[in-house]
């Protein structure tokens, strides 16, 4: 099953950072021109994935604007805090590194709290902290699509191979996007691209966190997954991993297949 998953997720055992950067920037340029859109939108958290996706997007925009003098493409970085983000300084460091065409902030707290209150008034029950976390992720994506629709831009997602294999994203939240420039990269490969790009070291060495749950703020991804990114990357790059780890990864992959598919129809058989 390991080789099948590697193939399905388009993972290469090794990447050359300069070549990979060029390939993905070119992809973003070509798809934007094909789409007829005016630019890209991305929610920027200050973590590794959005920093990398944002830098690639801004590089694509800068090159397009230099090559096509009669157009003016934009990359809009969107800050999406729930109240006050504890690592806001990292987000600002990411913005300083990327130098987006434009940066705006949409605080999602009022919208999320209103949605939570409406649910609880309608059902008479308390929305779990975990489900409220998913509401945050979906509200963030909704806000990005609002910005994208208003300015005629496409929404960028940050899904990569280590998230895809585990389904470690919110369905119709951070899993929703128009274009996914990091797809096929492992976590360590993403780090190598950021190193090549000269990103501030702390943006890709800090512990990754979705930071969605109020009861467990800053919960590290690896703790939530019960797997380390090193284990996931080793598996995805075709290396041998402990049998118990392999089984855990493959079990999670199968259990989250619905997240990697379009809504199931009567004509689909992948679930059988």
Swiss-Prot record:
Return any one Pfam family short name: NAD_synthase
Q: Which GO terms describe its molecular function?
A: ATP binding; glutaminase activity; metal ion binding; NAD+ synthase (glutamine-hydrolyzing) activity; NAD+ synthase activity
Q: Is the keyword Magnesium assigned to this protein?
A: yes
Query: What Enzyme Commission number(s) appear in the record?
Result: 6.3.1.5
Q: What does the UniProt keyword field contain?
A: ATP-binding, Ligase, Magnesium, Metal-binding, NAD, Nucleotide-binding
Q: What does this protein do?
A: Catalyzes the ATP-dependent amidation of deamido-NAD to form NAD. Uses ammonia as a nitrogen source.
Q: Which family does it belong to?
A: Belongs to the NAD synthetase family.
* Name assigned to this protein: NH(3)-dependent NAD(+) synthetase
């Amino acid at each position: 099953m390991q080789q099948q998953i590697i193939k399905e997720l388009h993972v290469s055992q090794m990447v050359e950072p300069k070549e990979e950067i060029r390939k993905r920037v070119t992809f973003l340029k070509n798809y934007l021109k094909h789409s007829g859109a005016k630019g890209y939108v991305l929610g920027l958290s200050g973590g590794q994935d959005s920093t990398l996706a944002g830098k690639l997007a801004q590089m694509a925009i800068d090159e397009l604007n230099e090559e096509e003098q009669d157009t003016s493409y934009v990359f809009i970085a969107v800050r999406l805090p729930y109240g006050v983000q504890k690592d806001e300084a990292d987000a600002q460091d990411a913005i300083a590194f990327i130098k987006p065409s434009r940066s705006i902030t949409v605080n999602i707290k009022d919208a999320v709290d209103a949605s939570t209150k409406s649910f609880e008034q309608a059902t008479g029950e308390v929305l779990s902290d975990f489900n409220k976390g998913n509401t945050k992720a979906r509200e963030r994506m909704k806000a990005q699509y609002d910005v994208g629709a208003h300015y005629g831009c496409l929404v960028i997602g940050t899904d990569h191979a280590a998230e895809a294999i585990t389904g470690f994203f919110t369905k119709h939240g951070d899993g929703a996007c128009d274009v996914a420039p990091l797809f096929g990269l492992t976590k360590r490969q993403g780090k190598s691209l950021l190193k090549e790009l000269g990103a501030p070291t702390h943006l890709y060495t800090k512990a990754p966190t979705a930071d969605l749950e109020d009861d467990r703020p800053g919960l590290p991804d690896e703790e939530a997954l019960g797997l380390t990114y090193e284990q996931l990357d080793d598996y995805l790059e075709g290396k041998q991993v402990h049998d118990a780890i392999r089984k855990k990864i493959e079990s999670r992959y199968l259990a989250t297949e619905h997240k990697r598919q379009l809504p199931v129809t009567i004509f689909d058989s992948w679930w059988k």
